[in-house]
Swiss-Prot record, chain B:
GN (gene name): VPS21
Annotated family: Belongs to the small GTPase superfamily. Rab family.
Biased composition, class Polar residues, residue ranges: 199-210
Disulfide bonds: none
Described function: Required for protein transport to the vacuole. Involved in two vesicle trafficking steps to the prevacuolar compartment (PVC), regulating the docking of endosomes and Golgi vesicles to the PVC by interacting with PEP7/VAC1 on the PVC membrane and promoting SNARE complex formation. May be involved in recruiting the MON1-CCZ1 complex to membranes enriched in phosphatidylinositol 3-phosphate (PtdIns[3]P) or other charged lipids, leading to recruitment of YPT7.
Protein name, per record: Vacuolar protein sorting-associated protein 21
GO cellular component: cytosol; early endosome; endocytic vesicle; endomembrane system; endosome membrane; late endosome; mitochondrial outer membrane; mitochondrion
Residues annotated for GTP binding in this entry: 14-21, 62-66, 120-123
Residues lipid-modified (S-geranylgeranyl cysteine): C208, C210
C-alpha cells in the first residue's frame, strides 16, 4: 500500500529516457548521472536529503534514496569513505588513533596502538593492510545480501566463504569438554543426544509458529530452554548459543537466541557448505564504498573532507566548514561521529564495545577450512582465565582476503563486557589464541576427520575444527611476532541484540518543542553507531527505518528492477527475486527449502 | 562463435568535465565493430569488441561524478586492468591533473595496468578554440610513463574507438587462456562465491564463464 505522503518515485519525478516496463527490449544507453547531462561543477544549492557520514547505514540509505529519486548530498568529514565502518591502512589508523585520543572522533575512546617497525619502513607497507573499524560477516540468507543483489552492488565486490566456527573451551582449544560430545560432528554422540539435537533443529527452523513450545520460556534464558525442553547438555547448549547463534552471554532470551540460531541454519548451504560470507579487501568499509558508488550512479553528490557546521531548521539551510551552504528540503541525517560542534541532540551512546585488532606474522592456515581465509573463534562465558561473563568473539582473516599480505593474519577480537573487565577478557582471549597458534604451528596437527554428513549432498552443518587438542601442556619455544595491535572502546546506543526501533529516530522529531537554543543540530536525525553485532543484520533495519521517515513509506526501498539483455545478469536478477521472496517475511522465513534439508538428516 | 572472451575492467580518470562520460557514451552507443547494443548493468557499462577473432569485453567504470569533489574510492581502481586518463586539450589545468592521476594509478592500481592518456575535445580547435596542451606534451608524458596516447573528440567521435581498440590490442591474445586459468585457480584457491548462484535451484547459469 502506498501511503498518501509517499514521495514520487524516480520514474514519476524524472522524464523517462527509456521505459523498462513498457518495453523490455534492448536498452541503448541509460540515463546516467553524468552521462546524459554533464554534472555541475559545484555542489547543489538545494537537495532533498543531506547525509553526513559514509558508514554502512548512511551509505545504504543514500543508495536507497538516490534510486528512489531523492536528490542526495552525501558528505563525510574524513578524506576516506566508511566513517564508523571504514577499512583503513596502517597510516590511516595512526591518524585515527591520534584523533580519537585528541577527542575529535566522538563515540570512540581509549585507543592504544602498537605498530612494528616492519610496517612502513621494513618488510610491509602501510597500504598492504586494510583494517576494519567494525568488522562484519554476511549471512548467506539475510536482508543485506538480497539488497546487495538487487542493487547489484555485489558486482563491485568479491565474496569468500566462511565455514569454520570454533569454540574455545576448558582452558584450551580442545574443542569441547569432552570431544565425544562434539555437536553434530561426532559419530560417538549418544543416539539420544543426537535425537534431541535433531528435534531441536527441526523446531528452530520454524520456531515462531510453535508458540506452545517456546512461549512458556519466553522470559527465561535460552540455556534453561535447551536443557529443560530439549534435554541438551552443556557442550551442545554452548555450541548452539555461542558458535552457531553467536550470542553474547548465557542470559540471552529465548526468542533472540532462536532467531540467531536459525539465521545460521537457514544460511547454511545457500551458496555451499558454509553459512556466512566475507567480502574481500575489507568488510563494511568496502561495502559502504559500493553503496556510495551506487548512490552516485543514481545521482547522489559526494563530497569527502566536508564537515557540517550547523543546520538551521527554520531556514532549512545547512552550513559547512568551507563556508558553503545547502538548502535541505526534507531531512538532515547525521552519524553521531559527524555531529557538528555545539550539537546538543546526539543520542546517548551508553553501551561499550571493546575491540582489539592484531596483525600477526604467521599464516595460521590451520584455523581455516581448506581454501578459505576466514574463521570465527568464540570464547564462551567462563572459558577464559579471566573468568569472562560475556563472550569474546575473534574474527580471523588471512591473506586470501587481501586485507593483509601473505604470511600474516588479522585477528579482530571484541566483547560486549562493559568497563575495565572487558580489556582483561580480551587480553585473556588473545593469550589463549597465541598459545594455541604456537602449538598448532609447531605440531602440524591435522584437522579432525570425524565428521557426520548431515545433508543430502554430503555437507556438514558445523565444521568446527579441534584446535590444538592434547597439546594443553605444550610450552612453545617461540614467541609470536605481532606487527600491529590496536585497542579501542567504541560506544553505541544499540545494546547487544538491540533491534533498531523507529522511535529512536524520533529524538528530534517533535519539531520545535525540542529545539534547544544555540544548538547547531536542531531538527537533524542521528543514525546509530554500529553495535557489537558481528553480522550485518542491524544495517538494513536501520536504513529502512530512516528511509521510511524520509520518504513516508518503505514500500519502494530498493525497489529496483534493472532489466537488461545481458543474459547472465538477467538470470541473476530472476534468482535475486526468488531469493527475496524466500526471505521477504523477514523473521518468518519460508520453510519449504529448509524443511527438506532437515528431512534428509537421517540418524 | 568465438568462445574466448577476455573481460577487462577499465576505469576512467581525469578532472571533472574533460569529457570522460562523453567518451564512454560515444564508445558504447556507436555502431562499433559488428557489435550489438551495449549492455547495461547497474555496476558498470559493458561493451564487447572483437579484435582479430578475439572478443574483449570492457567493463567500463565511469566515475559517476565522484571525482568532482575528490571523492573517488579505492574500490574504484582496484583490479583495473586498463585506465583512460583524460584531459581537455584546451585546459592546461586538466593536463596537470592527468599527471596526478597517472601517478595515483601507478601507486594504487595493479602493476601491469594498461593506461591510455587521452587528450579530448580536439574538435574545439577547429571551431576557433585555442589549444593549451601541445600534442608533444602529451606524447612526452606518455612516453615517459609508458602510456598509450590519443587525441580524441567525443563530440565528433574522432579517434574514440581507436582508444579502446588500442587497449584491446595491448591485451595479449594468450591472456584469455591465462586469465581463464588464472581466475579458475583463484576461484578454487580463494573460494570466491558468486552471489547469483544460490543453491535453491533457480540459478541454472552456473556454467557461465564471463
Ligand atoms: N566540444 C566538445 N565538448 C565535449 C567533448 N567531450 C565532452 N564535451 C563536453 O564537456 C562537458 C563535460 O563532459 P562529461 O562527459 O560530462 O565530462 P566528465 O565530467 O569528464 O565525465 C559536456 O558539456 C560535454 O558535452 C568533446 O570532445 N568536444
Ligand atoms: Mg562524468
Amino acid at each position: 500500500m502506498l501511503s498518501p505522503e509517499r514521495r514520487p518515485s524516480m520514474a514519476e519525478r524524472r522524464p523517462s529516457f527509456f521505459s523498462f516496463t513498457q518495453n523490455p527490449s534492448p536498452l541503448v544507453v541509460p540515463h546516467l548521472a553524468g552521462i546524459e547531462d554533464p554534472l555541475p561543477a559545484t555542489t547543489p544549492d538545494k537537495v532533498d536529503v543531506l547525509i553526513a557520514g559514509t558508514g554502512m547505514v548512511e551509505s545504504v540509505l543514500a543508495a536507497a534514496l538516490a534510486w528512489q529519486g531523492s536528490n542526495v548530498l552525501h558528505i563525510d568529514k574524513n578524506d576516506y569513505y566508511g566513517d564508523t565502518s571504514a577499512t583503513l591502512t596502517v597510516d590511516q589508523i595512526k591518524r585515527w588513533v591520534n584523533e580519537v585520543n585528541e577527542g575529535s572522533v566522538s563515540c570512540y575512546k581509549n585507543a592504544k596502538l602498537y605498530v612494528s617497525t616492519l610496517i612502513g619502513s621494513g618488510k610491509y607497507s602501510s597500504r598492504d593492510f586494510g583494517i576494519d573499524l567494525s568488522p562484519k560477516i554476511l549471512f548467506a540468507k539475510s536482508d543485506l545480501l538480497s539488497i546487495l543483489i538487487k542493487s547489484r552492488v555485489h558486482q563491485y565486490l568479491e565474496f569468500q566463504s566462511l565455514s569454520n566456527f570454533h569454540t574455545y573451551e576448558n582452558d584450551c582449544f580442545e574443542k569441547l569438554t569432552n570431544t565425544k560430545q562434539e555437536i553434530f560432528t561426532d559419530q560417538n554422540l549418544p543416539l539420544m543426544t543426537k535425537r534431541n539435537l535433531m528435534k531441536f533443529i527441526k523446531f528452530v527452523l520454524n520456531w515462531e509458529a510453535q508458540t506452545e513450545i517456546w512461549q512458556p520460556y519466553a522470559e527465561r534464558t535460552m540455556s534453561d530452554f535447551l536443557v529443560e525442553k530439549f534435554k541438551l547438555e552443556k557442550p551442545q547448549v554452548f555450541e548452539l548459543i555461542f558458535s552457531i547463534g553467536l550470542c553474547y552471554d548465557l542470559n540471552v532470551k529465548v526468542p533472540e537466541a532462536l532467531q540467531r540460531i536459525r539465521r545460521y541454519l537457514t544460511s547454511f548451504d545457500v551458496y555451499g557448505p558454509f553459512p556466512a560470507l566475507c567480502s574481500k579487501y575489507g568488510g563494511p568499509g568496502e561495502l559502504s564504498q559500493g553503496f556510495c558508488r551506487s548512490a552516485a550512479v543514481g545521482g547522489a553528490t559526494y563530497k569527502l573532507n566536508e564537515k557540517l557546521v550547523s543546520f538551521n531548521p527554520t531556514t532549512k539551510v545547512a552550513t559547512f566548514q568551507d563556508g558553503s551552504k545547502v538548502e535541505v528540503s526534507e531531512k538532515v541525517i547525521i552519524s553521531p561521529t559527524q555531529a557538528p560542534k555545539d550539537s546538543k541532540h546526539v543520542p546517548q551512546q551508553q553501551h561499550q564495545v571493546h575491540r582489539l585488532t592484531c596483525i600477526v606474522e604467521n599464516p595460521c592456515t590451520e584455523w581455516f577450512n581448506e581454501g578459505e581465509s576466514a574463521a570465527m573463534v568464540v570464547f564462551p562465558p567462563g572459558s577464559l582465565k579471566s573468568g569472562n561473563k560475556e563472550v569474546v568473539q575473534a574474527f580471523i582473516l588471512g591473506a586470501g582476503s587481501e586485507i593483509c599480505p601473505e604470511g600474516t593474519i588479522v585477528w579482530y577480537l571484541s566483547t560486549t563486557e562493559q568497563g575495565p573487565r572487558a580489556e582483561m577478557d580480551i587480553d585473556a582471549a588473545l593469550e589463549a589464541m597465541e598459545m594455541a597458534l604456537l602449538r598448532e604451528s609447531s605440531s602440524g596437527l591435522e584437522n579432525d576427520e570425524e565428521i557426520v554428513q548431515l545433508t543430502g549432498n554430503g555437507h556438514t552443518i558445523v565444521n568446527s575444527v579441534k584446535l590444538g587438542q592434547s597439546f594443553k601442556e605444550y610450552v612453545p619455544r617461540e614467541r609470536l611476532q605481532f606487527l600491529f595491535k590496536l585497542y579501542y572502546t567504541q560506544y553505541t546506543s544499540t545494546p547487544p541484540f538491540g533491534v533498531v526501533n523507529s522511535s529512536f529516530f524520533d529524538v528530534n522529531q517533535d519539531l520545535e518543542k525540542k529545539y534547544i537554543p544555540g544548538a547547531s543540530d536542531n531538527g537533524v536525525i542521528y543514525t546509530t553507531m554500529p553495535s557489537a553485532e558481528i553480522s550485518y543484520d542491524e544495517v538494513v533495519t536501520a536504513a529502512k527505518v530512516l528511509y521510511e521517515k524520509i520518504v513516508g513509506s518503505d514500500d519502494d526501498f530498493f525497489d529496483l528492477d534493472f532489466e537488461d539483455e545481458d543474459e547472465i545478469q538477467a538470470s541473476g536478477v530472476a534468482n535475486a527475486e526468488q531469493f527475496e521472496n524466500a526471505i521477504d517475511d523477514d523473521d518468518d522465513v519460508n520453510m519449504e527449502g529448509s524443511g527438506e534439508f532437515v528431512g534428509e538428516m537421517e540418524i | 562463435m568465438n568462445t574466448s572472451v577476455t573481460s577487462i575492467k577499465l576505469v576512467l580518470l581525469g578532472e571533472a568535465a574533460v569529457g570522460k562520460s562523453s567518451i564512454v557514451l560515444r564508445f558504447v552507443s556507436n555502431d562499433f565493430a559488428e557489435n550489438k547494443e551495449p549492455t547495461i548493468g547497474a555496476a558498470f557499462l559493458t561493451q564487447r569488441v572483437t579484435i582479430n577473432e578475439h572478443t574483449v569485453k570492457f567493463e567500463i567504470w565511469d566515475t559517476a561524478g565522484q571525482e568532482r569533489f575528490a571523492s573517488l574510492a579505492p574500490m574504484y581502481y582496484r583490479n583495473a586492468q586498463a585506465a583512460l586518463v583524460v584531459y581537455d586539450v584546451t585546459k592546461p589545468q586538466s593536463f596537470i591533473k592527468a599527471r596526478h592521476w597517472v601517478k595515483e594509478l601507478h601507486e594504487q592500481a595493479s602493476k601491469d595496468i594498461i593506461i591510455a592518456l587521452v587528450g579530448n575535445k580536439i574538435d574545439m580547435l577547429q571551431e576557433g578554440g585555442e589549444r593549451k596542451v601541445a600534442r608533444e606534451e602529451g606524447e612526452k608524458l606518455a612516453e615517459e610513463k609508458g602510456l598509450l596516447f590519443f587525441e580524441t573528440s567525443a563530440k565528433t567521435g574522432e579517434n574514440v574507438n581507436d582508444v579502446f581498440l588500442g587497449i584491446g590490442e595491448k591485451i595479449p591474445l594468450k591472456t584469455a587462456e591465462e586469465q581463464n586459468s588464472a581466475s579458475n585457480e583463484r576461484e578454487s584457491n580463494n573460494q570466491r562465491v558468486d552471489l547469483n548462484a544460490a543453491n535453491d535451484g533457480t540459478s541454472a547459469n552456473s556454467a557461465c564463464s564471463c
